[in-house]
Amino acid sequence: MAYNHKVIERKWQHYWKENKTFKTLDTTDKKKYYALDMFPYPSGQGLHVGHPEGYTATDIMSRFKRMQGYNVLHPMGWDAFGLPAEQYALKTGHNPKDFTAKNIKNFKRQIRSLGFSYDWDREVNTTDPSYYKWTQWIFEQLYKKGLAYESETLVNWAPDMMGGTVVSNEEVVDGKTERGGYDVYRVPMKQWSLKITAYADRLIDDLDDIDWPENIKEQQRNWIGRSVGASIRFKVAGQPDDTEIEVFSTRPDTLFGASYMVLAPEHDLVEQLTTPEQADAIKAYKAKIASKSDLERTDLNKDKTGVFTGSYGINPVNGEKLPIWIADYVLASYGTGAIMAVPAHDDRDFEFAQKFDLPIKPVIAGDNDYDQQAYTGDGEHINSGFVDGLAKQPAIDKMIDWLGEHHAGEKKVNYRLRDWIFSRQRYWGEPIPVIHWEDGETTLVPEDELPLRLPATKNLEPSGTGESPLANIDDWVNVVDENGRKGKRETNTMPQWAGSSWYFLRYVDPHNREALADYDKLKYWSPVDLYVGGAEHAVLHLLYARFWHKFLYDLGVVPTKEPFQKLVNQGMILGDNHEKMSKSRGNVVNPDDIVDQYGADTLRLYEMFMGPLEASIPWSTDGLHGANKWIERVWRLMIDENNRVRDRITTINDGKLTKIYNETVKKVTEDYEAMRFNIAISQMMVFVNEAYKVDDLPIIYIEGFVKLLSPIAPHLSEELWSLLGHDDTITYATWPTYDESKLVEDTVQIVLQVNGKVRSHAEVAKDMGKDELEKLALADEKIQEFTAGKTVRKVIAIPGKLVNVVAN
């Protein structure tokens, strides 16, 4: 009978659900393995075929490790707050809570249909008050430690998006929001921020202790951007002595080459330093660049722009006057928001100096045409007074000493990383548990009153004040304490990154009402052994989660410094036209359709066989057909037309499959460990091909093969396991072992030559000696044919390789 995927997959999914097959116990007498997927945002579109790739990888590892005797934690949940639900609610009038619940139901149905071995008793949802109670609790601990603060911050403000909201730098493209294309402006606004910068050094240094792709580590290092240099203070001509411009430079040794200064247009001193003659030009320039994101402003390929303020800085090392400009390539958020420009030795400064005809002063010796380019190489210092003749590092050290002695600067470590802007002007997010009182005091909502619940409302229209829609709910916003003091709740909500920064901890103990998770359980399960998800989260989610985890470690809440020991980024499944799948391109493949037509096991097998897990590969319907045919081929190998185990599966073992079976167990085990699933599948295909060539199939090998296959094709394997006479699920069957001695052939093929030319071959015992080899060669028909009529002069036998008959 043909393999009926619909009946068989439904049968085993029901069995797993009813028997809670994948329920995880918090036992400590077994080794643990924690396999985690980046939990999805439950969008209205549901899963696409890209989602199951990563989920299948973690599921294979989870099933594999269970059979190896590990206690496996493999959970799933929902990152369910976020902008799309709120936008949909505004557009349609639906409540985001109901919309999200409906989407989760659909996602869960789809995920169950793919046979993933999640423990659904541990499901978490970031929008559940019992979950975000602890998100709020973490915020309160950050606040108590001085790591959550409110300040006037320059933000990307999109006034027409959701009635006005802040978006991150990563969400801005060409002065517009990535989602929706709304205009973005840089404006100062009171925002909550988290002091991630306090953890900058640890976030860099501890990358050495985790098994992550090197490119992700490098992205995090670059994002944090640690650099060592000097803080240098410049007086301003015509200004009081206490008016100083502070500059951070990694090359203080080039101070003699500074020929102008540049401030970010948003720098606090711009207004004070702008002369009346330059005021209009400065104002116009600031308006012009207001909609540019930081990424656009620092684009190396863009044309340099700027305006002179009319003021001059004083170079502390030689007293020279340096014109002070503003330009958008200097960011208020990086360093001090001011630079000393050394155009002879910096490409951006050189371009700017050339455009505005500013002096270019070489201070490092090198063969260079300064009419054409800056010299950015190393060399001895020239035109540099007391550092003349010195190489780079000695000159830096000497200059820093000089600055310190003259109270004009000191050594400093700087970071590109900025504090994390933590507030959003949206409804659908975790309320920030803060009250602002009429007397100016700000307090936290008492811990015993958490969670501060997000109030239900039908009015999601913008407040009109730049605040979130929560500002419209008077009876929620306005509070009075026991002394009659009036206050207002914080109306901004947390960003979507909040709930995803600690969810992996809640899976360990999801129903705990007294703590975010029990410490002893965390000690058993932490850290996550395998984390699989997209590389696009390199510098946001993954950095934020590491920051929160380190903070919780410092509090004594978690036992490890790092949350995720091993990270794997699955590649992208592209459309069959090699483009990214998207609704607009019309190339999205719905997994529901594939499961219905071919079955979940076919989809799982195909996605793992497409290529290396990390590679981005186009979808191929032909490849899908091939995977489906192989599933049926495995079925036919073992099961006859009457749905019974074939008679050729027997206890008899004639040894014909011994070597290939042991090779297959060894190779598949090693390839699973290394997550080379495509290569493991290739080896299983080789075994099936060999199995079709023999008359008898030893049941011990067939059962072993079914175990090897089960992590990838669990429904097929459960059915075969059952038909082979087993009452229990294959889930906890013992992983097969191999015999190293069986991997070595007893026989070897040797070459038979006449006068050095190959004339024949022979299969011989591996340990056959020289005398026997000579006799065998001389008795070979082909050798006799080529030596007929000739005299054999010599026979050279090399055991295990060849016999050469010399004749003439």
From Swiss-Prot:
Q: Where is this motif: 'KMSKS' region?
A: 580-584
A single GO BP term for this record reads:
leucyl-tRNA aminoacylation
Q: Which reaction does it catalyse?
A: tRNA(Leu) + L-leucine + ATP = L-leucyl-tRNA(Leu) + AMP + diphosphate
Q: Which InterPro entries match?
A: aa-tRNA-synth_I_CS, aa-tRNA-synth_Ia, Leu-tRNA-ligase, Leu_tRNA-synth_edit, M/V/L/I-tRNA-synth_anticd-bd, Methionyl/Leucyl_tRNA_Synth, Rossmann-like_a/b/a_fold, tRNAsynth_Ia_anticodon-bd
| A GO MF term | ATP binding
The UniProt entry's GO CC annotations, sorted and at most eight, read:
cytosol
Where does the chain bind ATP?
A: 583
In terms of PANTHER family, this protein maps to: LEUCINE--TRNA LIGASE, MITOCHONDRIAL, LEUCYL-TRNA SYNTHETASE
**HAMAP family hit by this protein:** Leu_tRNA_synth_B
- Please identify the protein, giving its name as recorded: Leucine--tRNA ligase
Organism from which the protein derives: Lactiplantibacillus plantarum (strain ATCC BAA-793 / NCIMB 8826 / WCFS1) (Lactobacillus plantarum)
